[in-house]
Structure formats: C-alpha cells, structure tokens
Amino acid sequence: MNTLKGPGIFLSQFIDNTAPFNTLEGLATWASSLGFKALQIPCNHKHIFDIEQAAGSQQYCDDVKGMLAEHNLQISELSTHLEGQLVAVHPAYNHPFSGFAPQSVANDPIARKEWAIGILKKAAQASARLGLDAHATFSGSLAWPYLYPWPPHNSELFDESFKELAKRWLPILNTFDEYGVDVCYEIHPS
C-alpha cells in the first residue's frame, strides 16, 4: 500500500463474539459500510486472522486481500501490540501480562518471551506476503518502573533497560528488515 486513500480503523477493540464482529468478513462489511478504506488487523485473534497461516501461505494472504477488496478495503498494517509488549516485560509486571499469552507459556516469562518473538517474526513474513511495508507493535515495558522514581532517575537502570531492549529486539527487527517491512512502535507508558 503506497497511500491511504481514506480513513482506516484498528479492528482489535471491535472484535466480539457476536456478528458482524466475530469474523474478518463481518468486520470488513461493517467497516466498509461506515466508509473506512483500510484495516489494521491484530494478529492475536486466530478466528479473525491466522498469523501462522498467513506467514506460511501466500494463498491465504491472497484470499484475505481479495475478500477485503470485495468490500473496497485494504490492510494498512498487521499489528502485534500484545505480542510486542511480551517481548520485554519487566518482572514487576509478569503476572498482569501473563493473560496475553497462550496458557502453555503464560506463567513462564522466558517461554512467553520466545513465543512472542516467534509471533513477531511470523508477522514480518505475513506482512511481506500481504505486500505491506509497515507493522504496528509495542516495544515492551522494561523501563516503566523507572519513569517516575524517587529518588531521581538512575541513568544506569535506563542504560541497562535499553541495552536489554536492543538485545531482544534486534533479531526481530532484522527479520522485519529481511522482509522489507518497517516496524512502527506505538509507545504507551502503561
């Protein structure tokens, strides 16, 4: 996609168990009826968009794009906000974030991080298959406990946090680069 030719919408907050919000085609029909031209599609609702299948199947991606085109829609970006957050969870936040991962890795911070990295790398592949050149995600929360500390900021803690972020994110960024997709961080302090 070179230029967005109208408004776009992030689908995540509208996904529900009831029609039309329980399928990608239902969401596409709804969004198109409201005049939207592009969808940002989250990768954490397999029944809406299967990131595993999209990473491995050009046909799946072509089918999704074709269905959206029938509704005069295109994909602006895929998003891995929750998975990106799980790449770098500060230990103080382990419990609150455990619900964002599959039960099999939810309570194991290392396995959860590795699962999230795998999803992000699949999102790079899927983005390339879909012809996308941008991807939306969060960076994690390693430094959040240090944002408003008392006594004043400890630069060593920030340096350590950002070195660790670089260590965790460089392989992911390299994968996106390999597929020609830019990562767009959406930074939230909470």
Residue ranges and their predicted role:
Residues 1-3, 30-33, 67:
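N-terminal carbohydrate-binding accessory modules
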Residues 2-22:
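Boundary/entry segment of secreted carbohydrate-active catalytic domains
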Residues 4-10, 36-40, 70-79, 132-136, ...:
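Structural preference for beta-strand elements that scaffold enzyme active sites
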Residues 10-16, 42-44, 80-83, 140-142, ...:
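Active-site beta-loop-alpha junctions enriched in small/polar residues
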Residues 20-25, 52-66, 114-119, 167:
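Aromatic- and glycine-enriched glycan-recognition loops and surfaces
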Residues 23-45, 122, 129-134:
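Catalytic domains of carbohydrate-active enzymes, especially glycoside hydrolases
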Residues 40-69, 84, 139-147:
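Glycine-rich, proline-tolerant flexible connector loops at the mouths of alpha/beta enzymes
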Residues 70, 87-190:
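Active-site acidic/histidine proton-transfer and metal-coordination neighborhood
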